């Protein structure tokens, strides 16, 4: 409930960034490179990943390589939200990079891809049709307050086959 209330507070202040028009991608960055608010926008909201886009199966790099260790400043606009407390607690236990609220709209999916590092996922809003697939393992991550460590250096995707939004803190 607290995460969902925090999400409502954030959405009153900011809309999702679609990384300059990328279909099926939407994010709100909660932290930034100190003094650089532009590090939360456009391609910086997405970041580098690798994919095999066609039948040849050759891996290609997409988007900009980011040094996520530089993302150490919580965005001031969101300091009054519950996400600040969550961010502080998580950063005391884990070395965090970018922290984002990620939206996956109904009946949408990501590409089959891999990321440069593992991720923490905290589902905020989900439905039974939301599945994350890492290599050949498919799992539904319920919005029950749990923190899930996902090995996103392996090929994976996330899809929302339901009719409600899927929102994760990642």
What is each residue range found by the language model?
Residues 123-143:
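A short beta-strand-loop-beta hairpin characteristic of the jelly-roll/cupin
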Residues 106, 143-144:
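Short, flexible surface segments
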Residues 1-86:
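Non-heme Fe(II)/2-oxoglutarate
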Residues 101, 128, 144, 153, ...:
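Long, contiguous binding/interaction regions
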Residues 110-113, 130-132, 141, 150-162:
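Short beta-strand His + acidic residue motifs that chelate non-heme Fe in jelly-roll/DSBH
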Residues 120-123, 147-149, 163-170:
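A short hydrophobic beta-strand segment most commonly corresponding to one strand
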Residues 103, 114-130:
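Short, conserved beta-strand element in jelly-roll/cupin
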Residues 85-106:
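A short glycine-rich, His/Asp/Glu-containing loop-to-beta-strand
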């Amino acid at each position: 409930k607290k995460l969902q209330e925090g999400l409502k507070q954030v959405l009153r202040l900011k809309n999702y960034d679609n990384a300059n028009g990328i279909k099926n991608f939407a994010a709100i960055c909660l932290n930034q490179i100190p003094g650089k608010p532009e590090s939360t926008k456009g391609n910086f909201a997405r970041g580098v990943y690798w994919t095999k886009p066609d039948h040849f199966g050759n891996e290609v790099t997409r988007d900009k390589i980011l040094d996520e260790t530089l993302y150490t400043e919580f965005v001031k606009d969101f300091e009054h939200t519950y996400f600040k407390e969550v961010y502080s607690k998580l950063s005391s236990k884990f070395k965090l990079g970018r922290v984002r609220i990620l939206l996956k709209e109904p009946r949408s999916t990501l590409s089959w891809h891999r990321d440069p590092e593992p991720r923490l996922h905290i589902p905020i809003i989900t439905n039974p049709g939301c599945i994350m697939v890492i290599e050949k393992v498919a799992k539904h991550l319920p919005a029950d307050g749990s923190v899930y460590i996902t090995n996103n250096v392996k090929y994976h995707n996330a899809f929302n086959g339901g009719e409600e939004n899927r929102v994760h803190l990642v």
